[in-house]
Design a protein with these regions (language model features):
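Pyridoxal 5′-phosphate
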Residues: 1-310
Length: 310
């Protein structure tokens, strides 16, 4: 039994593997030529962009491909946050959020450290979201406890207060509805290799209306090559260098599968399996940490000391 899908989905659908192999055999570099292999690469990349835009309620040009969610989060954070800025985060954030903020010298304000009730979580954000907050960074689902945060209400609060929001959808993309348009977020970051069934080395940054990400890398984009500056339009501004075309082709196949299956159906199955697992673990004497707003993640501890458990 594989217990680590929260980190990486191990058994990729065969459609994903076939798409990767096909791209490796048939695709060159997009935007670097007009020959058949270059055009095949451009088509593969654009198809994935269109599928991601459709699933996450965005426009294709708002889809920036990254290496993973960490890459996407770093780009988003460094776009909005400067040294000394106060940034409001939840108590469930991953190091992909905490470490970039620390490296930037930002002051992090935590909206409660262990709030598993959606109303309490929203209240904590409302109390701490004052005029001195430069940005809010919030995970949609905790990668440790599987707690689903009330991201829609947090997003509405941010819009009301005029504070930009960065959403970490690492644990929710492909399992819960994620809409860039409805959330009105500045940025939404997600990996390709978890709930979207793509290969490792793939990720997506959704860029909200009017948002232009600060590039982490500068280089060739296949556009306005005579300029020494990175393009000032999406998605080129965030995509320096040759893209991971085989990975993106595999991600495209994963997105197609998620779209065909439906995130609601995927969530029902995962939640049912998680509940079944939690009951079994409790019957075996384990301490299980679950709540009413639960995803497919189950955290548990043996109900004895480590030596006895071993």
């Amino acid at each position: 039994i594989y217990f680590d899908s929260g980190a990486t989905t191990l058994r990729k659908p065969p459609e994903v593997a076939r798409a990767v192999l096909r791209a490796m055999e048939q695709c060159a570099s997009p935007g670097r030529g007009g020959h058949e292999a270059a055009m095949a690469a451009a088509e593969a990349v654009y198809d994935c962009r269109v599928r991601a835009a459709a699933l996450f309620d965005a426009q294709p040009e708002q889809i920036v491909f990254t290496m993973n969610a960490t890459h996407a989060l770093n780009m988003a954070i460094r776009t909005l946050v400067s040294p000394g800025d106060r940034v409001l985060i939840s108590g469930f954030e991953h190091n992909a959020v905490v470490r970039p903020l620390y490296a930037l010298g930002a002051e992090t304000v935590i909206a409660g450290r262990a709030l598993f009730d959606p109303d309490d979580t929203l209240r904590a954000f409302r109390e701490r979201l004052d005029g001195g907050i430069r940005a809010v960074v919030c995970t949609h689902v905790s990668n440790v406890f599987g707690y689903i945060l009330p991201i829609g209400k947090i997003a509405a609060l941010c819009r009301e207060r005029g504070v930009p929001l960065i959403v970490d959808a690492s644990q929710s993309a492909g399992m819960l509805p994620v809409s860039l348009r409805k959330l009105g977020a500045a940025f939404i970051a997600m990996p390709g290799h978890k709930g979207l069934y793509g290969p490792q080395g793939t990720g997506v940054l959704l860029c909200g209306d009017g948002q232009m990400p600060r590039p982490l890398l500068e280089g060739g984009t296949g556009s306005i090559s005579l300029s020494q500056d990175m393009p000032d339009f999406l998605p080129d501004r965030g995509e320096a260098g040759t893209l991971n075309v085989p990975g993106i082709a595999g991600l495209s196949a994963g997105l197609a599968l998620v779209t065909e299956t439906g995130v609601e159906r995927i969530f029902r199955r995962e939640a049912g399996e998680a509940a079944f697992c939690a009951r079994g673990l409790r019957n075996l004497g384990y301490r299980v940490f679950t709540g009413p707003n639960q995803s497919g993640t189950v955290s548990f501890l043996p109900n004895q000391d480590c030596e006895t458990a071993a």
